[in-house]
Amino acid sequence: MNQRPIQTATLSWNEQGTPVSEQFGDIYFSNEDGLEETHHVFLKGNGFPARFASHPQQSCIFAETGFGTGLNFLTLWRDFALFRQQSPNATLRRLHYISFEKYPLHVADLASAHARWPELASFAEQLRAQWPLPLAGCHRILLADGAITLDLWFGDVNTLLPTLDDSLNNQVDAWFLDGFAPAKNPDMWNEQLFNAMARMTRPGGTFSTFTAAGFVRRGLQQAGFNVTKVKGFGQKREMLTGTLPQQIHAPTAPWYHRPAATRCDDIAIIGGGIVSALTALALQRRGAVVTLYCADAQPAQGASGNRQGALYPLLNGKNDALETFFTSAFTFARRQYDQLLEQGIAFDHQWCGVSQLAFDDKSRGKIEKMLHTQWPVEFAEAMSREQLSELAGLDCAHDGIHYPAGGWLCPSDLTHALMMLAQQHGMTCHYQHELQRLKRIDNQWQLTFGQSQAAKHHATVILATGHRLPEWEQTHHLPLSAVRGQVSHIPTTPVLSQLQQVLCYDGYLTPVNPANQHHCIGASYQRGDIATDFRLTEQQENRERLLRCLPQVSWPQQVDVSDNQARCGVRCAIRDHLPMVGAVPDYAATLAQYQDLSRRIQHGGESEVNDIAVAPVWPELFMVGGLGSRGLCSAPLVAEILAAQMFGEPLPLDAKTLAALNPNRFWIKKLLKGRPVQTRSPATQESSR
């Protein structure tokens, strides 16, 4: 997903008070009654709200071209909320709304437009509270305690559609074919759009649109829809509705296939860290029944147990999968953490901003690359030494990049709070249960623990055991590394207490935590080392890195590590710095099935390519890991991705980025190039006991 700058909408307001797009010279909704127009064209045109009652699944998926002011979405949400209130026992429990918008509105313009419909005010306020920054790609927004999922894709719809993952194929129940009139926005209304709509629509799915233009009708028919002309809204004589009678088969990348779980009513999560807790909650939002097993006496005893951790995105200026993922992950994490705080979930934190310093030529070059993209200043901004120092409260000694929405939080506090919340929602927790063996027996997974503990059986299992992930037979070949890290806890001083934001250099230093009057400085990075003992050398190294990176100023001399307060954890790292999330791949079967994958793709006929089977995985076995040093940033989104995959839902990233998160990616990349796959990676050997 290319992080091209997203241009926001430029509006004017006509005499009727209707917003007008300066880009397209067209109104956003009817001058007569925008709300009634939405009901007539899009809801009634697709058979809603009456269709809610007969919908056979727990989730109903809508897609829209042109989010605009959000009027269609808000109207649908209001009608769905009324339906749920009147029919609490209905099968349908959740809405998933996917919308594409080339020119997103400023939140102030949204508020002005929403003011026309006081009956939608409570819904509109919730939307505006989570309105995302103008960043390219998908913004997943969770509303109504997870009953509403909104995927806002910012960018040109016809640029985005070819990048979408196979998880969107044959999924959409109803299309709101909106956007400005074909005469005003001719680039959108084309064959590519109509074909993509058909590919994404499930058999029996519908569409409606305000236009009755002949080329639109013919294009939709050629794509596979049955199209009907019906009475338009107000003075408009006709509009189009239609149904897709049969499934449209589309080309896929089966080697990166993401299977859903067969059963979500009996899921075991192995692990006691932040990603385990977030995954449990993401599954529970969808109705899953979850049991958690943790080797320790309480949660957050591993890498999630630190006092303070920095939250900021990982950028590299390459517009690649890594930058796409961490841009989405960071913004999603902030939205989710803010929602938790609003719900009264308490954890130490400060959204004080993060500054990444250009402390030498190498770091300066990296930051210059990061800034090649024209980021919104609310997301990332180049700053001089003077600007950074003013924000930080201390002389930063260098120029750098500032992340105003970043900050720090207490991973230990957060993990404990999330576990408590998941338990309140029905999760069963078993502590001091260290998994020894995982075996598939009679279509279930048998979990074997210590000698005095009975084996457990579950339909579906998620492994979230951090650096221990490669210990099991099924995950032994994954190229994961264990990396020891020691964080030093240093007492504040009158000078250090002036630090107002997180500083990142060849390490990091946090502002003082008011709860304990200490800062955190770290962290060491010892690859292949899983020991968690205190080490004086690493304590001193944490201090020395700060002194070495900021030699021009004297205040770092205030850092005192002599009381030897520290905490050591072990990260689970991957050489490409991206997490692994999805079904656990079957290593032996992958190599056997795909040994000639490159030849079949490059030289095989169409039928041979179409016959390539989906990637082999262990049945009902999933994983999330490899979060490295960025778990606070990545954990919320990878948990959401895994839960959505397991429930067979659309995923909130493009196909290229999702492929880069697939646990089989290293093997598949080599096989696609016709290169041999090593039996085991040295990185894996380092992390095994």
From Swiss-Prot:
SUPFAM superfamilies from the UniProt entry: FAD/NAD(P)-binding domain, S-adenosyl-L-methionine-dependent methyltransferases
Catalytic activity: 5-aminomethyl-2-thiouridine(34) in tRNA + S-adenosyl-L-methionine = 5-methylaminomethyl-2-thiouridine(34) in tRNA + S-adenosyl-L-homocysteine + H(+)
Keyword entries, A-Z: Cytoplasm, FAD, Flavoprotein, Methyltransferase, Multifunctional enzyme, Oxidoreductase, S-adenosyl-L-methionine, Transferase, tRNA processing
Family: In the N-terminal section; belongs to the methyltransferase superfamily. tRNA (mnm(5)s(2)U34)-methyltransferase family.
The protein's required cofactors: FAD
Domain of life: Bacteria
GO molecular function annotation: flavin adenine dinucleotide binding; oxidoreductase activity, acting on the CH-NH group of donors; tRNA (5-methylaminomethyl-2-thiouridylate)(34)-methyltransferase activity
E.C. code: 2.1.1.61, 1.5.-.-
A Gene Ontology BP annotation from the UniProt entry: methylation
Source organism of the structure: Yersinia pseudotuberculosis serotype IB (strain PB1/+)
Subcellular location: Cytoplasm
Region (FAD-dependent cmnm(5)s(2)U34 oxidoreductase): 270-689
Coiled coil stretches, renumbered: none
GO CC term, one of those recorded: cytoplasm
Name of the protein this chain belongs to: tRNA 5-methylaminomethyl-2-thiouridine biosynthesis bifunctional protein MnmC
Task performed by this protein: Catalyzes the last two steps in the biosynthesis of 5-methylaminomethyl-2-thiouridine (mnm(5)s(2)U) at the wobble position (U34) in tRNA. Catalyzes the FAD-dependent demodification of cmnm(5)s(2)U34 to nm(5)s(2)U34, followed by the transfer of a methyl group from S-adenosyl-L-methionine to nm(5)s(2)U34, to form mnm(5)s(2)U34.
Any matching Pfam family: Methyltransf_30
Region (tRNA (mnm(5)s(2)U34)-methyltransferase): 1-245
